[in-house]
Regions:
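Histidine- and acidic-residue-rich, metal-dependent catalytic cores
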Residues: 5-233
Length: 233
């Protein structure tokens, strides 16, 4: 299946402006979360195109995926930035970010923000039904969420976190494909996983060119999501 190239619009819609503003708010509070969100948005667009979705839908998914962690605005920073593994109670608090994100983004009537609300709510659902918050399984999970889920996990594995160093591309792909104590092979849609493996080299190159250090201050100084997308592939 041939990937479709994104053609960013020059006119920012209200929902696009909202996505950028919310992303900047999140960056101001937690730079780690922001760099992660920006990369997930771009990777989701690329993967959606590879799966045959039209360019307009790829852009919509990208903008929505950019806000997938917006619910972390409600989570105490001392938990998000804790320099050691979380307790079971703290992990339970982290998991509430999906419902908080849905609450923040839903009810506007704007199709883009409603998609963002859906992704915020269900990007941690798993194909095998072991995810949260609703334990959805298989195609009960929307395709935008199945796409965002694998991009989210890949980027989280690569990224340095307060309590651990990021993985190499090779190790991150090994975990995604084979599983470990955090993941299982059955948690991803097989078709989405296959497509992601097909662009493994591109994904590695994109991440290497857009680490947290290289993205620092980039979006908040006037660079729009359109320009990030245009420069991605």
């Amino acid at each position: 299946m041939v990937a479709r190239k994104l053609k960013p619009s020059r006119t920012a819609s209200p929902s696009r402006v909202a996505a950028q503003c919310l992303s900047r708010v999140l960056e101001t509070r937690d730079e780690i979360t922001h760099g992660h969100a920006a990369r997930v948005g771009v990777l989701a667009a690329r993967l959606a195109g590879l799966l045959g979705l039209p360019a307009k839908r790829c852009e919509e998914i990208s903008r929505a995926a950019l806000m997938h962690d917006i619910g972390k605005l409600v989570i105490p920073l001392e938990i998000i930035q804790r320099p050691f593994p979380l307790s079971q109670e703290e992990w339970g608090i982290i998991q509430t970010h999906s419902r908080h994100g849905y609450t923040i983004l839903s009810g506007t009537g704007d199709p883009d923000l409603e998609l963002a609300a859906e992704i915020a709510l269900h990007h941690h659902e798993r194909h095998d039904g072991s995810g949260y918050p609703d334990g959805l399984k298989g195609h009960d999970i929307s395709l935008p969420n199945r796409i965002t889920a694998i991009c989210d996990v890949y980027d989280a594995l690569r990224q340095n976190r307060p309590y651990r160093s990021g993985m190499s591309h090779r190790d991150a792909m090994r975990v995604i494909i084979n599983g470990d104590h955090r993941t299982a092979p059955g948690q991803f849609d097989p078709d989405v996983l296959s497509a992601f493996q097909g662009i493994s080299g591109e994904v590695d190159a994109y991440y290497t060119a857009n680490t947290d250090e290289k993205l620092h201050g980039h979006v908040t100084t006037g660079t729009t999501l359109d320009r990030i997308l245009k420069a991605s592939w």
